[in-house]
Every structure is written in structure tokens, then in C-alpha cells.
């Protein structure tokens, strides 16, 4: 029933995405520096502010700014102290199970698990420190324990292989059929209705054989593999539409934790966690994972975005006309006078967290300019309304590159 409700929610959300408007212009109540100074929070105060939330997203304006990763090192322990127990990454579902096994049981090698080239931006000393800290807490007896999850459905072939391996143990006859069904999403798949329909039959078949599968394995393993079959369904759509279908699965996978009573910390890019749709190179808006979460959870979802004024960061650069690329250090482009980084720099602080719920002063309300970069360059500059997009912002004056552990090429 809960899964049905979540699926229905995801179907209904797009009709409501653009109805939300939280920014209210208020008259000038003080100078920008004074207003920002009065609102600015330290990390401990921020953790208390969001303690009653079910999900707190820690968004990144670039995927590889040290100061934002360092903030996670500081914020995660404080959020865990307020009952948050799941650290969910914008990262692949199956591959990140190795990190969960490490923090839960101490098995495996977290350094090897983070060395995943498509998600190179998490393979940093800062994130490794968070993972090792989580393991230390669990080893000391923290109850309930901290879990780590990948919530991205971008590698369904890996997950499909897991499902088939499970079926080979509990139902060898059907395992062969499932393997044949999943074969259609082999390398180079571009999407067919026949494949999509066939893939969607695996999960109902597993449901119909629940008792036998639980008897042959365990309830926990059965439920995990049943959901893995759902990840394959999600991933088939992602393979076809790439990043334009990433967000609904991420939201659905987060809500699965919430439905179990777990409080979640999200790691990922700003644009995925904002409470409204976002734009990339194309004109049309993309419903964000955060927009689905905002409708599902209301004020129990807190989206902390981030911004930087200047400095450097890491991103992949592809040479013109060449399909190969490498990770390089890049400088933020110069901000326009109406850039959010410029507005927040008026506080003359190197870093601060500023809550944005409620009426905003006239100089901050409404639409201004925002620069951001993903895992690749170029840097994009777009209009944005932070009052509608985020519940708060982590401002960093000067960005420096993350402490990357490996430097893959592409």
C-alpha cells in the first residue's frame, strides 16, 4: 500500500510543481549586512533548527568544492545526534551497498568502494572521513545504526545481475527467465516498449512467490531484492532519458526510507534537491527530486542549498570534438552584480548558513542570478529564486578543490 501511494504521488506531483511560491517581498528592515548577520547560523544551531525534519538535503553548488564537503564532515555528526540515521548519496544504488556493509559490519574496503569513476566527486578524503566516522559510531554501539545508501538508478544492469543472482538461489527456473528479460537493457539500449513491459513483470512475479522466497532466504533479503527489481524498472527509464529521468527515482527511493520511520541526510547537487523545478541547457524545466519531496513531506523536508562567491573547484573537461575528458581545476566565472554570491558577500563572512523560510527583504526576494557547475564544465548561469528554491543556504566566500583520492579519465 505504501509503495502504491508513493507511486501515485510521483504521478501527481508534476501538476503541482509550479503552484508553489514561498517568497514574499517585505520592505527594507535593515541593511543587507545586518539582516544576514542576524539570521546567520552556526552548524550546531542549524542542526537544532532542522531536528524535526524527516529529510535534510545538503546541496552542492559544484560537485567538488572542499568547503562544502568539509561542512558535511561537521554537519553529519550533529544531525546524527538529532536522530538522523541514513546518509543517502546521489550515487548508484547497488554499488553503494559496499559502503553500507562497511559502516554496518566493518566488512570491505571503503576506499575501494568510493573509487567509482562515474561518481568520482565522492571519492575524496572528506567523504571518506564521514564514512569512517559513521563506522566508528556503529562499532561503538550506536542504536539504531547509521546506514549509507545510493539512491540513483543510473546503473540498472548491475542491479539486474543482483536480482538474477538472488533468484538463482531461491528459484533457479525463474532466474533463467528473469535473466532473459533483463538482457534487453544490455549496453547500447535506447528504449523499447517491449523491454519496458517485460522488465515490469519481474517484480509482480517475485511478489506472487513471496512465501517461498522468504523461506529460502530471509524476509530482509527478499524485501531488499524485491526493491532491487524496482530499481531496475527505474533504471531502464534513466538509460533512455539519462539525467532527465534521474529525479523521480531518487525521490521515490528517499521516501522509502521515510516510510520506514528513518530520518535521512541527502548528499548531492543543489539542482536535484531544490524545492522547485530546475533548468540546465535546455529551455524546459526538469522536476527536481526535491520538488517531489517537498510535496510529499511539506515542512518536514529541508533543502539546504549552497553558493560560492569565487575560487576554484574540480570538474571534468571534455576537449572540443573529442569524446575523452579529464578532471581539472577550474575557476568560478566572475559574478554579475545581481548574483546571489555577491548579495550574500555583503555580510563580509567567509562562511555562514542563512535560513530562508518566511518573508525575505526586498533586496533578496525574487529572482537573481546563480552560477553553478556539475561534474563537468562549463559553468552555467541561470535566474533563480532562492526563497522558493531553498529553505536555507550555506554560503562560502571562496571555494577550493576537494581532496580527490583518484583522478580517473573519461
Where are these regions (language model features)?
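Structured catalytic-domain cores with a bias toward divalent-metal coordination
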Residues: 17-410
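Positively charged n-region of N-terminal signal peptides that target proteins for export
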Residues: 1-4
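Hydrophobic h-region of N-terminal signal peptides that target proteins for export
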Residues: 10-17
